[in-house]
Amino acid sequence: MNNSKNKNEIKFSILKKINNPIELRKLPKKKLIFLCEELREFLIDSVSSSSGHFASGLGVIELTVALHYIYNTPFDYLVWDVGHQAYPHKIITGRRDQIRSIRKKNGLHPFPFREESEYDILSVGHSSTSISASLGMSISARKEGMGRKVVSVIGDGAITSGMAFEAMNHAGDIKSDLLIVLNDNEMSISENVGALNKYSNNFISKKIFPFLKKNGEKLLNKIPRFKKIIEILENKINNYFSPKYLFEELGFNYSGPYNGHDVLLLSNILKKLRLKKGPNILHVITKKGMGYAPAEKDPIGWHAVPKFNLQIGIPPKKQNSLNTYSSIFGKWLCDTAKKDKKLIAITPAMREGSGLVNFSKMYPNQYFDVAIAEQHAVTFAAGLAIGGYKPIVAIYSTFLQRAYDQIIHDIAIQKLPVLFAIDRAGIVGPDGPTHQGFLDLSYLRCIPNMIIMTPSDENECRLMLHTGYQQLGPSAVRYPRGYGIGVKFSNLYKIPLGKGIVLRKGKKIAILNFGVLLIQANIVAKELDATLVDMRFVKPLDNLLLIRMAKTHKALITIEENVIMGGAGSAVNEFIMYNKLLVPVLNIGIPDNFVSHGSQTEVRSSLGLDSIGIKEKIKNWLNFLV
């Protein structure tokens, strides 16, 4: 152990002395190159032994070091968009020795988090929030009058969101002092800008100039002034389609593009930009996964990884014979599209996570990835439905909330047949409070015309997707992250709308389960000799079944992996009270708190949503079971 420790001390001789950016700024500039080498090696070593977001952090090593070297953080505000690229930031802001605990229970938060460090000025997790927040901070800094600077780092797809452009439009209008660093790692803006550049190049090379060179070369040589005009025109067209033109039209001073892996160059540029007034854009070109060849070749596959062997260089696949809910959705989607050419699948930049890879390859004409644009995705689906198609929006629960008005205004009011396949519902786990999906039942249940289904296993998920797809109005199927339980698949059939199933008959109490906690509920039902009902539908409820349960039992227990407030249990409460049914009801779910990170099992246990916790909650509530 001592030999290993000594080797690490030699290996990271500069990094081990950097416990905060103040110590970083004491380094001679020439040593920054060596620090970046050590930081990259340390990040590779730590993530390979602990898991976490990987490729994005490797791409911003030099940028992170340069920003903290030039800016007086934490007095100057450094804001990271999304935050999965912030591991290097955490390492050099006092959390180096804790980095292996990231995303684990009681460990470092997976993203910048205000409660964790004074250097994390904005808690993040969702994309495209940084520019709006940074603009607000810059206005505050101007009113404060102490010379505070504000920097926003955005990229990795976040710039494609409408919110980012809304903020830039505002910033360019009010001319506030703000630096936006566009981290162009070829996974975000580069394709869009590249397409425009390709268009302009084709326009010039294939239409105007070949014709002139072939048929008018002599004329051009005889009329130098005309030749000069053509050259000016070519430059203007190229400028029109460049990032510089785009950002300058929004009111920003544009600098770049520059090599984002040259820490000395970045330091020199940032030193000048720190003194520059008004809204500024620094465009840097980086490579996601830089410094680890397998991640450079496959940045998507290496975006977030479990523990892995550095020498093998292959992201390990989880050994599990069971299917994930995402893959089950993807298989159902392919099977349905084979029979119905009207099916259209839509995802806001979550092709891999939502299980759409195979579908996108098999049915490219029925597949749309709209980028990080949840609002657009939903209203786009509305338009398709009006046009006679059958759209399915595949989206994470936590991201669907970004399109709430569109669900109401563009889908529900018009009773359009759009199916929402809501992945990562309930407890998600290691990505923390920004990614837990436990609000959707509450915010969807209050919307008129909405059908909401909560499958308890993977076969139920298939049946509910099939049922939702047949509806003439909006419907939602919410399912969790992770694997099913291994049940056999039945033939697809349409589930009777709003009908639950009694799985076990007991005495005194009835447990009404909504969703994937059915296994835990079944264990408790057997131990307490309780009736167990798989309610299946949150909306509409099985009213007749509820009346029967209320009249034949002394108490009802509702169980759901959603916040208690406004959720499925609240729907039961409302029904019981409205119908004057004299039976007490205990709602078990997620309390009125945001839930931190940890494994799904750990989080459920801490919330009392495992079988032990559920039984304890029930026994504490029911006097006759004490």
From Swiss-Prot:
GO terms for cellular component: cytosol. This is 1-deoxy-D-xylulose-5-phosphate synthase. Catalyzes the acyloin condensation reaction between C atoms 2 and 3 of pyruvate and glyceraldehyde 3-phosphate to yield 1-deoxy-D-xylulose-5-phosphate (DXP). It holds the Pfam family Transketolase_C. SUPFAM superfamilies: Thiamin diphosphate-binding fold (THDP-binding), TK C-terminal domain-like. Keywords: Isoprene biosynthesis, Magnesium, Metal-binding, Thiamine biosynthesis, Thiamine pyrophosphate, Transferase. Its EC number is 2.2.1.7. The keyword Zinc-finger does not apply. Its cofactor is Mg(2+); thiamine diphosphate. It catalyses: D-glyceraldehyde 3-phosphate + pyruvate + H(+) = 1-deoxy-D-xylulose 5-phosphate + CO2. Mg(2+) binds at D156, N185. It comes from Wigglesworthia glossinidia brevipalpis. Binds 1 Mg(2+) ion per subunit. GO terms for biological process: 1-deoxy-D-xylulose 5-phosphate biosynthetic process; isopentenyl diphosphate biosynthetic process, methylerythritol 4-phosphate pathway; terpenoid biosynthetic process; thiamine biosynthetic process. InterPro entries: Dxylulose-5-P_synthase, THDP-binding, Transketo_C/PFOR_II, Transketolase-like_Pyr-bd, Transketolase_C, Transketolase_CS. The gene is dxs. CDD domains: TPP_DXS (cd02007), TPP_PYR_DXS_TK_like (cd07033). Thiamine diphosphate binds at H84, G125, H126, S127, G157, A158, N185, Y292, E374. Belongs to the transketolase family. DXPS subfamily. It comes from the Bacteria. Homodimer.
